[in-house]
Amino acid sequence: ARATASDEGPPVDDLAAGAGSGFLGVASAAGEAGAKSVVTPERRMAREFAPDKKTLDALRHEGFTAANFVPDSGVIRGVSAFVSLGSGDPDEAVIRPETFQHMAIDAPRSSSSESSRPRAYPGSLMGVISVIRQTLLDARFQARDHAHFSQNPASRPRPAFSTMLDALQPVTAQKMPVVFEPASVLMVDRAARLAGEFELRPLILATGQEWRRPDIMRGIDAPFIVPVDFPEAVKLPDDEDWQAMPLDQLRAWDHAPGNAALLRKEGREIALTTHGLARKTSFRPNLRLAIARGLSQDDALAALTTVPARLCGLADQLGSIAPGKLAHLTVFENGRAFDEDSRVREVWIDGRQYPAPVRDEKKPAAKKDTPNPRHTLTAAPSNHDRGPLLEPKSVLIRNATLWTCGPEGRIENASLLVTDGKIVKAGRFKADPGPGTHVIDLPGIHVTPGLIDCHSHSMIMGGVNEGTLPSTAMVRVADVLNSESETLHQQLAGGLTVANLLHGSANPIGGQNCVIKLRDGAPPEGLKFVDAPAGIKFALGENVKQSNWGDAFKSRFPQSRMGVPAFHTNRFTAARHYMAAVEKAANGGPPVRRDLELEAISEILCGERLIHCHSYRQDEILAFLRVMEGFKVRVATLQHILEGYKVANEIARHGAGASAFSDWWAYKFEVLDAIPHAGAIMHERGILVSFNSDSSDHARRMNLEAAKAVKYGGVSEEEALKFVTLNPAKQLRIDARAGSLEPGKDGDFAIWSGHPLDTRSVCLQTWIEGRQYFEREAARQRASARHSEHLALIEKAKKDRKSVV
């Protein structure tokens, strides 16, 4: 059902309805303190430049004559200033007072003491990205709103003015570049996408993890500022401690020195920085290590001279030796700039000489003819053992038991043909393989549709909950997909092909979900199930009223179960008012601030976004359904739904699906009446039922979760399997492509050693869109290869420790 935007009501900013930017914690003149404290684009480092002699000396001793002085805290941090590193008056040292705006994409961190008291928004990585997105939208809106007022001063109120948003006008107008500081290689991708979304001029501070996803770097058209802060080999006392060091940590240590060379190989322009170095004296030794790992000396020199000068808009003053340019020079002795024995003799800044002290750089204890173990790469190439194992034109399975989960039911001695990623035939037919067909003919195998998990929190970076506010409809799980998680491989090993990644249950209105296919090896965007309708997480019960959060959490509304429906009513009412204002603006009225929270709720009202609601108790379930019916909204799924069996008729009448736990009960007070027969009872009453994992571990054996519907309630085997295949596909509105083995659907299937509901059966192969992503024997070989790589890296790390003692 679709709601209209013409409902009468108070203005959009009526706080009684819970509307207005202040409610969201989005930075504004009257905004919530949390977001304001981390959004400070008006900060100017030119006003704060007051370096101590020790800092200046350390940089000059490494050969630097000028530097870009950057803000180091917050999300939108402020404007950097390019300064000379001479010892004169700091005000006279400023060469360019406004260089770049800086934005950090990193999950907020808190101490153990801070975790026991309320935190301000944003409290998660997805919240940080939402703050950046909303603030940039607000900056655009301020410019548009003031322009409209200047043309219509007599017909509307004067708009508010924010110095913070005014500071972002050069950014949104593409007059000032933005340096994004992502915390991981996947956030490099997100930074580039944000820059594209808002047509910004981006630079990227490299994370040191670019080796993980060179394919992502290949597609990013932005210069990189590259630290030479490499992790050191950990010194551990005995072999057992070494064995406990994770392979991924050793890989990161081994790959790090080659990061700059990799970026140049991928065609990215780089500038080098001392950022992250605990000791500036490590800069030149680390740079020589980067050169040994493939960075050319010419590229290294350019990355310290011409490139940063041009990126900072100072190519006419710095970066090369030429008449008319500033007299900034670095003099080396004992060889060229980056030779092993060369050293900085002196620097000249604005025509003044600064001699470098004579110092003995640490030399390796090993003999000169002993090669440095870090000069070569031992770790396996990134992503080499991920991605499709087979990509045939067609795949034909013969002599199998097909569990179609469609009208044909279970078929013995059947065949399945998949071509170009789509199912062509399923059943008993003459199966003659054509050219390029991969044939699977194994005795006793069973084939099911790929399993689907309707409630997962796996593969989410930087926090599952944005729990700082009662409504966080503006945050998006799609912004923080973790394509590098080993969980992908582990869940493929259980036959899982699709997962509904949900925000947590910390608030009555949570964040937007993301449905993915488990295409292990793909980048974050490659995981997304593109045709899946948009959705959002809601929640009821103990979690949202904070009764289980601790004594310090007593100020956020709602604090009672009866407050939850009131809150939902407030936010949906606010969304109606927002829709009316947007409609009025489209018909010539004043522009309306785009509000990402209310926009998402408006999509629910328009039938464009599905609700997946965490729910336990029957009274709350009924109250929630009645509130939604009042707004002409049909709930897509009630998640967990532990007391759903008590109100099964009402749920069926509403038309909501039930995505339930198979057999969870008595793990907290509000689930004391939960029973393992709930799924079967709701199924009998005509509710579309699925079983979900809510657990990265349980998601590895969803077939056995389905089997519990047979044990508890006597559901037929074929119907029970649908609880983890066709039914969740229908709940997610993706059943046109997934959930059953029928012609025209995606070639997503799992091959089992025996009956799929038998505890003794194992998944042999998992295919997605006609590509093989898991094969049991290949997985064994993968584990063996990783073990050998782990041992080799441990030995290399031990040698490196000895070489620097």
Task: Describe the residue ranges of each PLM region.
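Histidine-centered catalytic micro-motifs
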Residues: 1-2, 452-459
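Histidine-rich, glycine-flanked metal-binding segment
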Residues: 1-12, 17, 407-448
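Intrinsically disordered, low-complexity segments enriched in small/polar residues
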Residues: 2-32, 143-159, 231, 240-247, ...
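Aromatic/His-enriched, Gly/Pro-containing loop or helix-boundary segments
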Residues: 9-55, 315, 442-443, 457-461, ...
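N-terminal pre-domain segments of enzymes
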Residues: 10-28, 364-391, 793-795, 800-802
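His/Asp/Glu-enriched, well-ordered alpha-helical/loop segment
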Residues: 21-26, 30-34, 42, 177, ...
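Polyanionic/metal-chelating signatures
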Residues: 49-202, 206-211, 338-344, 349, ...
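C-terminal cap of metal-dependent C-N hydrolases
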Residues: 322-364, 400, 742-786
